[in-house]
């Protein structure tokens, strides 16, 4: 679910300014509002999906670590900042290079396989770990995994790079 939010924020957010070109021509308002609205819409969708996930966790009897659950809003906020930064960057570039909208679908798919979503980070060879850790979504997904699957409190300091990148962009 977190990856779907991130991926859809980038792909849909990249085309947001181009899609609303008629509105932009008619009314003056800060252009940043458009990608923000698209990313926020995807974020609300993710929050609603998390309600279903928590219901499944409770019904299945898997259990929840409530102390670890308190870190979930921080993880979500960092992911939101990163997705918003990427969406703003790609939406600005897409205005000049319209094909970027289509290329981003392929890029996010490749990015998904470079992020430990369907596999554990421990299977990555040690010599590739420095390169692997450059991916900001690796840290975000690892924190989600720690809270939801391992029921542990994640190391939130690993999220600083993702938050910093999102703010920088």
Where does each model-flagged region fall?
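Hydrophobic alpha-helical transmembrane segments
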Residues: 12-27, 48-57, 102-119
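Alpha-helical transmembrane segments and their short interhelical loops
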Residues: 31, 36-107, 151-169
């Amino acid at each position: 679910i977190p990856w779907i939010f991130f991926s859809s924020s980038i792909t849909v957010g990249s085309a947001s300014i181009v899609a609303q070109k008629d509105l932009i021509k008619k009314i003056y308002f800060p252009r940043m509002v458009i990608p923000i609205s698209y990313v926020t819409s995807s974020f609300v969708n993710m929050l609603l999906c998390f309600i279903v996930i928590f219901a499944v966790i409770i019904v299945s009897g898997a259990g929840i670590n409530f102390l670890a659950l308190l870190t979930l809003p921080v993880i979500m906020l960092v992911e939101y900042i990163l997705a918003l930064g990427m969406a703003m960057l790609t939406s600005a570039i897409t205005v000049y290079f319209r094909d970027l909208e289509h290329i981003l679908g392929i890029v996010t798919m490749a990015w998904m396989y470079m992020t430990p979503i369907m596999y554990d980070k421990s299977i990555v060879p040690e010599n590739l770990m420095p390169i692997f850790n450059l991916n900001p979504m690796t840290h975000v997904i690892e924190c989600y995994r720690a809270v939801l699957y391992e029921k542990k409190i994640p190391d939130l300091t690993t999220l600083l790079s993702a938050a910093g990148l999102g703010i920088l962009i």
